[in-house]
Curated annotation (Swiss-Prot):
InterPro entries (UniProt xref): Kinase-like_dom_sf (IPR011009), Prot_kinase_dom (IPR000719), Protein_kinase_ATP_BS (IPR017441), Ser/Thr_kinase_AS (IPR008271), TPR-like_helical_dom_sf (IPR011990), TPR_rpt (IPR019734), U-box_ubiquitin_ligases (IPR051348), Ubox_domain (IPR003613)
Protein name: U-box domain-containing protein 70
Main enzyme class: transferase
Species of the source: Oryza sativa subsp. japonica (Rice)
First and last residue of the signal peptide: none
Binding site for ATP: 451-459, 472
Residues in U-box domain copies: 730-804
Gene Ontology biological-process annotations: protein ubiquitination
TPR repeat intervals: 15-48, 49-82, 90-127, 129-153, 154-187, 189-221, 222-255
Length: 805
């Protein structure tokens, strides 16, 4: 006995420890852990119902309301059996009520929760429980009131639907029946009525669905069977319709409409089987339906009558039946394309309005029967016209679909041809790099090598075939990025100029462009950084203005088609070692085509792109891109070089200063004292370039170049610019052959990746050398690849410096 007491005491102590652990987990909201502790405690001490009430509280927070109710019921039953404290029982009932309230909010049934709260109050009075009871009763009243209002609304919509149905306005009637269903989805009459509307509208599948719902709600409602059988009969399912009519007979064996439906089904079955049937045949068909002989006799009589009617039917009757079937088919097709054919819907709506107007006139003028008949004939003619119009629309729709498919196919073919042409163009004009070479050069597109990022891709610095290059990786999944890739290759493959960035090659597989690397970044970097801006002397700025002007003139005079840059701004003007400027970023540039209406060249687009502060206002408003668009951007760039200020409102600032005669107040004097004459000439020229009207802007190759060239020559003749001129005469290191140490005339790439003069490397190989002149490593092969891009760059450099000399 003492051993049992010791075991019980030990179990109770262990249960208390489990309760404390569960309470601690509950306070920290570790609800699953709390449930496990309470469960073990309940097993150790079954007489303590607090384990059940505590676990119910955890389940309540976990939204496991059914488990909460189960634990509360068990706690109440065990508490009453053990005569536990009424407070514990009341607490269990209150938590049960809380769970039931949560369930009631979803199921809209507050009665179980109210009963639980009333029982809790009976066990132990609590203000909190009383308040919950009041809230539950108020919620129940709200639900009852809402149900009453919903029922009234449902009755109202059903009555309105009946009115429209009597007026043969079946579409409006179906809409009101639908609203009635939303308010009271358990009324079989509404489903039956809407099924009849669907039948008249030709929506047979929807009518069959509504009839099935009507029967499911009330299997004794005869009209549901009538609607379902009628739909099945119209759909040609005669045997199924016959079985449905037989089910309807169980509701009313003497209903004439059901008997008439049975006769029609029997006639249809007989026609489908190609002959008359006897009473024995009818009993065999209906054998599984357990019908009596009297009903079979009635059906046989109906079939005999149908046979007589069949013999009397004329060819015209058969044609009319076929026409009605065709009309139903057309109506079904119309309903399936309502959303796609709004014009057809409007036309049919007008026809329905005419129907309604004719109906009103018919009700008001009943004595004029002849007139109403004539109007009905006119209406039938209009309906026939609308059907013909509908058929025409269908044929037009099919034609448009075919044209669309042809257009898509042509676009795809053009895209393939364009890609092939682009591939040939890249192969002919530049080196084609592989994706692996690009990934290796950028260290798998490392962020540490990223030197720029734009809307269509990123720019990386890398070493490619032992040359420091700039690699622009465009987004291949972007249409804009692909367009920019094709545009830049197309433009830079056609034009060459000392002040246009050199395209060394491309990787069409990854939409990557490889340019010469210009170490000093962009002109925007210098203008935005105060330290760098001071290194950009006024002589250098004038030289940059002249270089950009000459590059634009070259593009605009390109043959056979002029080129417009379209996005000229300091960020797209790159600077080399000696601050030699080069235009870049030809992604939105365009080749201009001669207009057929006037003697101008332009490019027209519905979606102008570029940098708004530098864009031609007329290009923004009309979408027409011309060389004068670059003139406007050039004027803004000149103003920025003069003032060092941001582009926002820069034109107004300079204009105001010139009107006040205080132009020096806005000039950037941090780079030295500008010659006053140069300032006025450049400011006046820039303001003319930024005129709102294109016609008022000067021509770059005429007046602008004459002024800019004179200012440049005067600026470069100053002593401070002589040193930079000497630096510019030195050729870049990668123009020098590693073997001959002279500027290369015919550069070729060897197997080691280095570029040599063709004659020098061939002589090296012919003398028996099989190693690299640069790395002394064994060459894999002796094949040489012409470096056309480098050769073109060398020729441009030589041409430029021969002209300057």
């Amino acid at each position: 006995m003492e051993a049992e007491d010791d075991e019980r005491a030990e179990a109770e102590a262990e249960a208390r420890r489990e309760k404390e652990a569960g309470n601690a987990a509950y306070r920290k909201l570790y609800l699953e852990t709390a449930v496990r502790h309470y469960t073990r405690g309940a097993l150790l001490d079954p007489r303590d119902i607090s384990f059940l009430t505590n676990r119910a509280a955890a389940y309540l927070l976990m939204s496991k309301y059914k488990e909460c109710v189960r634990d509360c019921d068990e706690a109440v039953e065990k508490g009453r059996e053990l005569r536990a404290d009424n407070k514990l029982v009341a607490r269990a009932l209150a938590r049960k009520a809380s769970a039931l309230l949560k369930l009631a909010a979803c199921a809209a049934d507050y009665d179980p929760a109210i009963r639980a709260l009333q029982q809790s109050l009976a066990e132990h009075y609590s203000e909190e429980t009383l308040a919950k009871l009041g809230e539950a009763e108020e919620a129940r009243k709200e639900i009852e009131e809402r149900e009453r209002l919903d029922q009234e609304a449902a009755d109202h919509h059903r009555d309105r639907g009946n009115d429209f149905f009597k007026q043969k306005r079946y579409q409006e009637a179906a809409m009101h029946y639908t609203e009635a269903m939303k308010k009271n989805p358990k009324d079989p009459r509404v489903f039956s009525n809407r099924a009849q509307c669907h039948i008249y509208l030709g929506a047979l599948p929807e009518g069959l669905e509504d009839a099935d719902k009507c029967i499911a709600l009330d299997p004794t409602f005869l009209k549901g069977y009538l609607r379902k059988a009628k739909v099945q009969l119209l759909m040609g399912n005669y045997e199924i319709a016959l079985a449905t009519y037989v089910e309807g007979l169980k509701c009313d064996p003497n209903n004439l409409e059901v008997l008439d439906g049975l006769r029609r089904c029997a006639a249809c079955i007989k026609r489908a089987n190609g002959g008359d049937s006897r009473a024995e045949d009818l009993r065999e068909i209906l054998g599984d339906l357990h019908l009596n002989d009297d009903l079979c006799n009635k059906l046989q009589k109906s079939m005999d009558e149908a046979a007589v009617l069949k013999k009397e039917a004329s060819d015209e009757r058969l044609k009319r039946i076929e026409s009605e079937r065709l009309a139903r088919t057309l109506e079904d097709l119309y309903l399936s394309q309502v959303q796609q054919r709004k014009e057809t819907e409007e036309s049919l709506s007008r026809v329905q309005q005419e129907f309604e107007q004719l109906k009103i006139q018919q009700d008001e003028v009943t004595v004029e029967l002849q007139r109403v008949n004539e109007q009905n004939e006119n209406l039938l003619g209009q309906l026939s016209d609308s059907r013909e119009h509908f058929e025409w629309l269908l044929s037009e729709h099919d034609q448009l679909l075919r044209e669309r498919d042809n257009a898509v196919r042509e676009v795809e073919e053009l895209r393939q041809k364009r890609g092939q042409m682009l591939s040939v163009l890249v192969t002919a004009m530049h080196c084609e790099f592989s994706s692996s070479e690009v990934e290796s050069a950028t260290e798998n597109f490392s962020n540490s090598l990223k030197i720029g990022e734009g809307g269509f891709g990123c720019v990386y610095k890398g070493i490619l075939r032992n040359m420091t290059v700039a690699i622009k990786v465009l987004r291949p999944d972007s249409l804009q990025g692909q367009s920019q890739f094709e545009q830049e290759v197309s433009i830079l493959s056609r034009v060459r100029h000392p002040h246009l960035v050199t395209l060394l090659g491309a990787c069409s597989e990854s939409s990557t462009l490889v340019y010469e690397f210009l170490p000093n970044g962009s002109l925007e970097d210098f203008l935005m950084c105060s330290d760098k801006r001071q290194t950009l002397t006024w002589q250098a700025r004038i030289r940059i203005i002249a270089e950009i002007c000459s590059a634009l003139i070259f593009l605009h005079k390109n043959k056979p088609h002029p080129v417009v840059h379209g996005d000229l701004k300091p960020a797209n003007i790159l600077l080399g070692v000696n601050l030699v400027s080069k235009l870049s970023d030809f992604g939105i540039s365009r080749l201009l085509i001669q207009s057929s209406t006037n003697n101008t060249t332009l490019y027209r687009t519905m979606h102008p792109v570029g940098t708004p502060l530098y864009m031609d206002p007329e290009f923004l408003s009309t979408g027409e891109l011309t060389p004068q668009s670059d003139v406007y951007s050039f004027g803004i760039v000149v103003l920025r070089l003069l003032t060092g200020k941001p582009p926002v409102g820069i034109k107004n600032i300079v204009e105001d200063a010139m009107e006040k005669g205080d132009l020096n107040s806005v000039i950037d004097t941090s780079v030295g004292e500008w010659p006053h004459l140069h300032i006025e000439q450049l400011a006046y020229l820039a303001l003319r370039c930024t005129e709102l009207s294109r016609r008022c802007r000067p021509d770059l190759s005429g007046e602008v170049w004459a002024i800019v060239e004179a200012i440049r020559d005067a600026a470069l003749s100053s002593p401070s610019s002589s040193r930079s001129a000497q630096d510019q005469n030195s050729p870049p290191s990668y123009f020098i052959c590693p073997i001959s140490q002279d500027i290369m005339d015919d550069p070729h790439i060897a197997a080691d990746g280095f570029t040599y003069e063709a004659e020098a490397i061939r002589s090296w190989l012919c003398n028996g050398h099989d190693t690299s002149p640069m790395t002394n490593l064994l060459l894999e092969h002796e094949e040489l690849i012409p470096n056309r891009a480098l050769r073109s760059a060398i020729q441009e450099w030589l041409q430029q410096h021969s002209m300057s000399l």
